[in-house]
Every structure is written in structure tokens, then in C-alpha cells.
Amino acid sequence: MIPADDYPVTELTKALIARPSVTPLDEGCQTLMAERLSAIGFNIEPMVFEDTTNMWARRGNEGPVFCFAGHTDVVPTGDVSRWHTPPFVPTIIDGYLYGRGAADMKGSLAAMVIATERFVAKHPDHNGSIAFLITSDEEGPFINGTTRVIDTLEARNEKITWALVGEPSSTLKLGDVVKNGRRGSLTGNLIVKGIQGHVAYPHLADNPIHKAAPFLAELSQMHWDNGNEFFPPTSFQIANINGGTGASNVIPGALDVMFNFRYSTEVTAEILIERVEALLKAHELGYDISWIFNGLPFLTGDGPLLDATRIAIRQVTGYETDPQTTGGTSDGRFIAPTGAKVLELGPVNATIHKVNECVKVDDLEQLALCYEVILEQLLC
């Protein structure tokens, strides 16, 4: 029996972690993956946009197209002195592999490659096509990554049928949760206008903080929707608020407020914008506002992809998975609008973005097995 430390998926994960690919850097991770995929018949298409390295790899010319999607970039390490081991020196301690990106998401990338190698060895004449969509711009501004690759594919009418994103979806144990959808995300940047002046002469000024306070209080208490069986109710949160010069004797001339909606399929971004701007007008505020669309909500219901994933997790782990739509956004939001069915399955997310990020070594092998079974269910 192969020791867990020597699993092929463990070795590949370690090789990826050793490349310090802090967003938007790739540091050769995609080249390493491409070499493995090219050896089993994949056509490799690098797509570099500005500072971002992307890869579209495909084996086969027919549909349906099953796509593994993920990212090679990682978040910064934070205070290195707080790490038990150097963050880019992959180290196994008590059955856990430590290193930045171990769980988010170099372990998933390695599992995808290993699963595909095994699947192709067993089924060289599989149905349809297998693809990889990999970017180095998921943890950053997500401008030149997956969204640009999707634009390229759409322009030539190259469609993805099913996409499996390797984001760390699991909560307590591998596969206990999969993400079969995500809420939409909409950010508002609001400037409430006033007139700067001396605090001793308020009649000669117009305090935007005083003017905006009742509006913000009402906005924060508004009911947006009730959610549904798949999504919680839409949430509104103020993320940043700034006004004033820092002096105690100056009434500010403007108030800057940044806020975010995480919204369900019960509303649209257009409805949210309309309601916010109607409230601004009702409070008779002078303002400028700009909106950033971070992603539409999407949902993958019962069907081949979710069914195959349920079967794989049950077969490999012995328990049932729980499909959820909670949490933040992922690059799945750029793939779903094309009509693809999108699902997220990856390691336990307890340590992602933290110091001492780690993944259970045995989970990496189980994840590779899950991915392999999913391929068998969909392409055999």
C-alpha cells in the first residue's frame, strides 16, 4: 500500500505549493499542469491577458464537454512568523499538508490532474471532451482571468456542458458540502454631497453625514426578499464609510459609503438599484453613485452533474453530500451564464486564507477518487 505521503496527488500538490504564485502570479504552476495533460492527449492553449496567465486545455473535439475549473493564484501569506512552517515549503505534519494554497486550491488542481490521468488510462476512448480552465486571477480583481477566457470561448462558440470548480466547498469533512449555486453580488459606491464648513457655523455648511444618517438607517433595515428553498434572503451590508478631514472643527463636504448586496434569485440587480436610488431621492439627497456587478446568482439543480457528484461522494466516502448556495462568490459565476451547469467540490475550507493553511493528506486522495468517479459517470 502506498503511504499517504507518497500519493501521486500529494506529490503534485507539494510541487504546486512550492511555486509562490501570489495573485496574479502563476510561477509555472500551469506549465507543470500542462506538461502532465499534454502527455495524455490534451491540446494546450495558453491565454495571457495583461498580467494574468490562463490556460484552456481540451482533450476531444465532441460534446458534451466536462470542464475542471480552478485557479493557481493564492492570497498573500500574511505574517510569515506566525506560520509553523514556511508557507511555500510544503510540509506534512501529523497527516496534514501545510502550505499556502494547500486547500485553496492547489490540492484540488492536483486531484483534477491525477483523476484525469487515471480516467484516460482506463477510458482512452471516452465520450465527449474533458477540459481544464485555469487562471491566475481568481484571488485578485478577476478582470483578466476566467471571464476573459469565457469571452474567448463564447466568441468561437465553444461551449462547456458541465463545469466542476475545485473551490474548497467542504465544511467538516471532505464532500460533506458541495456548492450547487451562488448568490449574486452587487457593490454600490455612494458619494453623498454636502458643503464643507466650520462646525461653529453650521448654517453656512451642509453636513452630509447628518443628511445621510436617516437614509442609511432606513436602507439597512429594508426587507429585500424572503429567499427561497435554494437561497437565503438577500443581505445588505455597509462595508466602508468615510467622511471628514480628520479635524474636529470641520464639517465634511462629502460622505463616501461602500455597500454590498448578496442577492438571491428572487430579485435582480436592476430591482436592487431601482429601490436604492428611489430611497435616495425620497430623502432628497444630493449624490453620485456607481455600481459594480460582481456576478449573477446561479443554481444547478438535479441533473447529470449533481447526480454524478452525489454518487461519487457516496461511493468514495460512504456518506451523502449536502448541496448549498451559501458563502462567497467563485469563478463559477462567469461560467454559469453561458448555460453550463456548475458545481463546486473541494477540500475542507477551515484554514483557507489563514496562516498555517493545510489540508488532510488522505482527503487529497479521496478528492481525486471523487473526481474520477464523476468523470466515469458523465463520460462513460
UniProtKB/Swiss-Prot annotation:
Superkingdom, natural source: Bacteria
Keywords: Amino-acid biosynthesis, Cobalt, Diaminopimelate biosynthesis, Hydrolase, Lysine biosynthesis, Metal-binding, Zinc
Residues involved in Zn(2+) 1 binding: 71, 104, 167
The keyword Amino-acid biosynthesis appears for this protein: yes
Active site, per annotation: 73, 138
Note on cofactor: Binds 2 Zn(2+) or Co(2+) ions per subunit.
Residues reported to bind Zn(2+) 2: 104, 139, 353
UniProt cofactor(s): Zn(2+); Co(2+)
Enzyme Commission number, as recorded: 3.5.1.18
Biological process, per Gene Ontology: diaminopimelate biosynthetic process; L-arginine biosynthetic process; lysine biosynthetic process via diaminopimelate
Top-rank EC class of the record's enzyme: hydrolase
Pathway membership, UniProt: Amino-acid biosynthesis; L-lysine biosynthesis via DAP pathway; LL-2,6-diaminopimelate from (S)-tetrahydrodipicolinate (succinylase route): step 3/3
Catalytic activity, as annotated: N-succinyl-(2S,6S)-2,6-diaminopimelate + H2O = (2S,6S)-2,6-diaminopimelate + succinate
GO molecular function, one term: zinc ion binding
UniProt-listed SUPFAM superfamilies: Bacterial exopeptidase dimerisation domain, Zn-dependent exopeptidases
Keyword Zinc among record annotations: yes
Pfam families registered for this protein in UniProt: M20_dimer, Peptidase_M20
Physiological role: Catalyzes the hydrolysis of N-succinyl-L,L-diaminopimelic acid (SDAP), forming succinate and LL-2,6-diaminopimelate (DAP), an intermediate involved in the bacterial biosynthesis of lysine and meso-diaminopimelic acid, an essential component of bacterial cell walls.
Subunit note: Homodimer.
UniProt record similarity statement: Belongs to the peptidase M20A family. DapE subfamily.
Protein name, as recorded: Succinyl-diaminopimelate desuccinylase
Lineage, highest ranks first: Bacteria, Pseudomonadati, Pseudomonadota, Gammaproteobacteria, Alteromonadales
